[in-house]
Regions:
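Terminal presequence/propeptide segments associated with secretion/organelle targeting
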Residues: 1-181
Length: 181
């Protein structure tokens, strides 16, 4: 998962970094967003480096081999734990694509273009309207939403968001190419 997540975040960061270099207003608008996106990006890069440096995959494989030998050489353990690692691998393989797809969606929708989060911010208003119609409660929620929108637009640049949307949509489709009709 980390390589895909790093790639998605790097794609967003490339668009944001280029825009931030273009003018001071955009640099100020996107400083916190860039930082938020890059924190996990840097963490995952560090995790991958650490796993390689410590040869974690090789050590895991050696430990699994030792476990299988111990189990195989002990009848009681073999009856109880024989085939356990194979079953775990089968379960992991069965869910691997679902986990990947879930995290790809999260990276695209929740950490990608602000357009998605912006649209989602209206969900409460839609539900209130469906439940209570044109009520005072709906009007009050609408006023709160207006205040939220003012803060949103203060640090929003539609050109940057479109750039992120375009770049991430291409990545998203590339990663999902095997699932498309």
């Amino acid at each position: 998962l980390n390589p895909m997540r790093i790639d998605m975040r790097a794609t967003s960061l490339n668009v944001i970094d280029a825009a931030m270099r273009s003018d001071d207003k955009t640099r100020i608008q996107y400083a916190a967003k860039q930082s938020r996106i890059s924190n996990a990006y840097k963490k995952w890069i560090g995790q991958n480096r650490g796993l390689k440096k410590l040869k974690a995959v090789k050590k895991k494989q050696e430990t699994e081999k030792e476990f299988e030998e111990l189990v195989h050489n002990n009848k009681e353990w073999n009856d109880q734990y024989g085939g356990l690692l194979a079953k775990l691998k089968n379960n992991q393989d069965a869910f691997e694509q679902s986990f990947f797809d879930r995290w790809l969606f999260i990276e695209y929708v929740y950490y990608g273009p602000e357009l998605f989060r912006f649209a989602n911010s209206f969900e409460k208003l839609v539900k209130l309207y469906e439940e209570k119609g044109n009520s005072q409660e709906l009007r009050n929620a609408g006023l709160k939403q207006t205040a939220v929108l003012e803060g949103f637009y203060k640090d929003f640049n539609s050109d940057v968001d479109q750039g992120i949307f375009k770049a991430l949509t291409e990545k998203y489709l590339d990663y999902n190419s095997g699932h498309l009709p």
